[in-house]
Structure formats: structure tokens, C-alpha cells
A protein has these predicted regions:
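Helical "lid/coupling" subdomains associated with nucleotide-phosphate turnover
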Residues: 1-32, 47, 55-57, 64-244, ...
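Catalytic cores of RNA-modifying enzymes
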Residues: 36-38
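Short, charge-rich patches within N-terminal targeting peptides
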Residues: 245, 250-251
Length: 258
């Protein structure tokens, strides 16, 4: 009825677009970056060659994002929360954390990420409501402000302190926090468990907070990415004349000749 055509993208394309959306948050001296995109049903981890991203420039990034490795984990704030919804949140959090920890450990690429983080050659970019809310809590904002959150840095110590606060205040306390509110309060702990597990896997990693990601990557790709050639329309010379046109031309020729 609307005339709109929808396209379902795969996990790899989602990882690519999230990387494009966050490209200008890559630190100039970084050798590589882990983009952590936490969604409702999955979490995409993209290990990006930061040097290649700088050398190739924005256009090169659009044509081919220099992703060294990536994975789509069956972990999301909704699915993880639902899996342990039968438990009190105090009981549920350690179990959610353990489940997230085990799932991340199954990705073979995590070892290379951990080594690079330990050598201080890499950092993380976190793009999700969970990460932006954690930043808002850490910054003690009286309301959510994108200009303060987007691009700010979270150390592991600061991030875990914010997670502890959210666990300690409980559901009602989270609902009263101005940067979380009613809508996100129920899903914050499952998202925190995922972030917590990522930091456990990469303990030396700093995380840059991104209030941007997949949507912005999609828009940038549509606006500036390689354009698909449009199908050529046949000109008038290429058209086969209709019977009506032929008859009219024959009649005109007879009149001109008589």
C-alpha cells in the first residue's frame, strides 16, 4: 500500500554499516578498533584495521570497510533478558554475565583483539543504548545530552562503576535516573552483562561511546557510497513503432503522394 520496498540485511552488512557510522570516532593513533554493536537480538563485534581506514579515507571505507574479522553473537538485550526473566535480577545478573562470557569466548577472533588491547594499540567503540546510558550515568547528566555523550571515553573502571550503581539501585532506582527512565530500565542489566563480558575479554580496552551506528552508516552509504547504474531507458529510435503509428504514417504518405 505504501509503495516502499524493504530489504533485510545480513549480520555482516550490519557490522559493515555500524563501522561506517562510527568511522570518525576512531582515534588517530589507533592500529585497530573493536566496534561493539549491541542490539535487541544479537551483538555484532567488528575488528577493524584502523590504519587502513585512515589510509583509504572515507570513500575507501564506503567501498570496502577494512574489517579484519567479525562475528554476530546470539546475544541481545531483549533475548538475554527474556532467557532469565524467571529469576530475580539479583540472581539473574551473574548468570547473564556468565552466559555472555561463554558466548564471546567462542569467537576465535577474540584472542587477537585481547592481545592488541594489551599492547595499547587498539580501543573499542560501543554503539548501543546500553553504552550511551552508561556514559550518561558516569557523567552524572541531569538529562540525556548527545553532545556530551557521543565521543566520550569510558575506561573499564568507570564503566564497571556505572554498572555497579545500576545494579545497586534496582529497577525503581534505574527508572528515576534521568538518562535511563522507564523505557530502558528493564533492559539495562542484560545490556550491562554484555558490556561487562566484553571488558572481561579485553580488560585493557578503553571504550569510546557512539550515539550513532547502523542507521548513520546506512544513510552515509546511501548518500556517498558507490552508485548502482540505473537501467537505460530505450530512446524513441529504439522503440518498435506501434500499428497505430505505422498506419498513420502510411496514410500520411499516401496523402502527400496524391
Amino acid at each position: 500500500e505504501t509503495g516502499l520496498t524493504f530489504k533485510i540485511i545480513g549480520a555482516k552488512e550490519e557490522a559493515r554499516l555500524a563501522t561506517i557510522g562510527c568511522h570518525d570516532l576512531i582515534e588517530p593513533k589507533a592500529a585497530s578498533v573493536l566496534v561493539v554493536d549491541i542490539g535487541g537480538g544479537s551483538t555484532e563485534l567488528s575488528w577493524v584495521d584502523a590504519r587502513a581506514a585512515r589510509e583509504n579515507g572515507f570513500k575507501g571505507l564506503l567501498e570496502r570497510a577494512p574489517i579484519l574479522d567479525w562475528t554476530s553473537l546470539p546475544l541481545g538485550v531483549v533475548t538475554l533478558s527474556e532467557a532469565f526473566s524467571h529469576l530475580d535480577e539479583v540472581e539473574a545478573y551473574p548468570l547473564m554475565l556468565d552466559h555472555a562470557r561463554q558466548t564471546i569466548a567462542e569467537w576465535p577472533g577474540i584472542a587477537a583483539v585481547r592481545d592488541a588491547m594489551a599492547e595499547s594499540e587498539a580501543h573499542m567503540i560501543g554503539t548501543s543504548g546500553t553504552v550511551t546510558c552508561l556514559a550518561g550515568v558516569h557523567l552524572k547528566l541531569d538529562r540525556y545530552r548527545r553532545d556530551k555523550v557521543d565521543g566520550t571515553w569510558l575506561s573499564q573502571e568507570d564503566g564497571l562503576a556505572a554498572i555497579k550503581l545500576l545494579r545497586d539501585v534496582g529497577m525503581e532506582g534505574r527508572m528515576k535516573l534521568p538518562t535511563i527512565g522507564d523505557e530502558r530500565a528493564g533492559l539495562m542489566l542484560s545490556g550491562c552483562a554484555i558490556v561487562d563480558a566484553v571488558w572481561e575479554a579485553c580488560p585493557a580496552g578503553r571504550m569510546r561511546v557512539a550515539d550513532r551506528g547502523l542507521r548513520e552508516g546506512l544513510l552515509l552509504s546511501m548518500m556517498y557510497g558507490p552508485k548502482k547504474p540505473k537501467p537505460r531507458r530505450r530512446g524513441r529510435r529504439g522503440r518498435k513503432p506501434s500499428q497505430t503509428q505505422t498506419g498513420a504514417e502510411n496514410q500520411k504518405g499516401t496523402q502527400d503522394g496524391g
